Amino acid sequence: FFFFFFFFFFFFVVDVVIACFGHDSGSEAEGGDRTFALPSKQKELITKVISKTTTPIVGVVTAGGNVEMQSWIRHLDGLLWAWYPGQEGGTALGEILFGDINPSGKLPVTFEKRWADNPTYNSYYDSDNDKHVEFTEGIFMGYRGYDKSGKTVQYPFGYGLSYTTFNLSQMTVEPAIGADAILKVICELKNTGDVAGAQVVQLYVGKKGESKVERPLKELKAFKKVYLKPGESQKVEFSLSEDAFSYYDVDQASFVVDEGSYDISVGFSADELLLKEEVVIKKPTGLQSDIFVDKTYLLPTVVEAGESVNISFGIVAKADVYNTSGVLKANLYNTDRIPTTGLTQGMYVVHMCVNDKKINGKFIVK
């Protein structure tokens, strides 16, 4: 009698139901594809929990990617996406659920509402079984694809809540002073909540008007995580090089920047851009040349920083080394190799003069 009395008493003082469900290695693993739906028993579990209680429910989902949640998400009061957190995952999740840690994670992907909404849906299945798939989405994957289609998503790229709130204000864009940076973007982030926490400020760039190629509405170009105490404010600064405005031109075998207007937006996710400024790039820049770029002129084509790249046909009278933004990084004379000391990670194009002929090559510092 006392046991049952205690049990029912305990049941009625529960503040929150924590429902843990999702996938494991039996339903989601390398070497196979799972369905977008939850495993049937897992969906049955969360459905029963929802039907049996009016107590607030917090869902904890273990999965390596998005799942169909239209049938149950509206009944949850909170959702913690655990991914696969490892052997200490229980400790980490407990600290988040009980408020010892203020979460600040952001989604690295977009969570669609339906699998058919995904930009890669039409190229995922080999419907005619000819072992040939057309990747028709091109660069319009993830949030770029949803911007293009206008589909409403479940949770956008870069989304994530915490136990506090933040505000962005006072955005400015001004010329930058530096070797590579051309613009400096500054905004002010304030913790407007009651607990300390971190926020990830995200910066997106979008070309306005026409371009030689079809381009996304916006693209993530920079982000910073900032930790603030309650009521604290901090200036958040981004430096943008020409890379932030460039695209690869196949005809020119180089990254180029179109002249014209661009929107620079900052916010907390791909769908929560709170501040925006328009800038104008007045002239095209970058390595624009009608000379064919042949990587075989330089060997090896991929090197560690500090190693040398050999010029395959011997000594050249002159070699100019540029990064992909068109910034000159080195002038070399009467040389048969390109030293990479002082070069950062990335691709470089070399303009060489051989017997009064101009030849280009390229290499990568990894």
Where on the chain are the PLM-derived regions?
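C-terminal non-catalytic regions of proteins with extracellular/luminal or membrane-system context
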Residues: 1, 7-302, 325
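C-terminal outer-membrane/trafficking sorting elements
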Residues: 285-366
